[in-house]
Amino acid sequence: MSRHKSKSIPGRNLRLADQIQKDLAGLIQRELDMSRAGLITLSGVELSADYAHAKVYFTVLGAEPDAAAALLNEKAGWLHSQLYKLLHIHTVPTLRFVHDAQIARGIEMSALIDRANRPGPAADEPDEPDEPEDRR
């Protein structure tokens, strides 16, 4: 009798995370009234190694990120039960919604780069000397 070590299937984590993101986006769009939370976009899903937990990253437009996260986390149990019906896997991860601040940071960094590249007087160029005043 041979023993087999349990090895995860290469790429399964990424495929499952993508499928969870796709299914959650559809459920949120079709089934939930998220008008109080603004426009929500799911930007990624990060699964734990045992698939028991998932961090779902989102961005929001037109509302406070904390309020949107609270509303999404309030609905996490219902979304989990709906995922169980859609995904045909043994363990459906517990969902935790987290605001994705990387996009906002990227926009800020882009603005800083644009400002630094703007044509204008360089900081290391000396100013033109003032004209001598007439001393009489």
Swiss-Prot record:
Cysteine disulfide partners in this protein: none
Keyword Cytoplasm: yes
Gene Ontology CC terms: cytosol
Keyword annotations of the record: Cytoplasm, Ribosome biogenesis
UniProt cross-references to Pfam families, sorted A to Z: RBFA (PF02033)
Transmembrane segments: none
GO biological process, one term: maturation of SSU-rRNA
Annotated region (Disordered), positions in chain: 114-136
Tree of life domain: Bacteria
Cellular localization per UniProt: Cytoplasm
Molecular function terms, GO-annotated: ribosomal small subunit binding
Comp. bias intervals (Acidic residues): 124-136
SUPFAM superfamilies assigned: Ribosome-binding factor A, RbfA
Stated family: Belongs to the RbfA family.
Function: One of several proteins that assist in the late maturation steps of the functional core of the 30S ribosomal subunit. Associates with free 30S ribosomal subunits (but not with 30S subunits that are part of 70S ribosomes or polysomes). Required for efficient processing of 16S rRNA. May interact with the 5'-terminal helix region of 16S rRNA.
The protein's assembly and partners: Monomer. Binds 30S ribosomal subunits, but not 50S ribosomal subunits or 70S ribosomes.
Listed name of the protein: Ribosome-binding factor A
Originating organism: Bordetella petrii (strain ATCC BAA-461 / DSM 12804 / CCUG 43448)
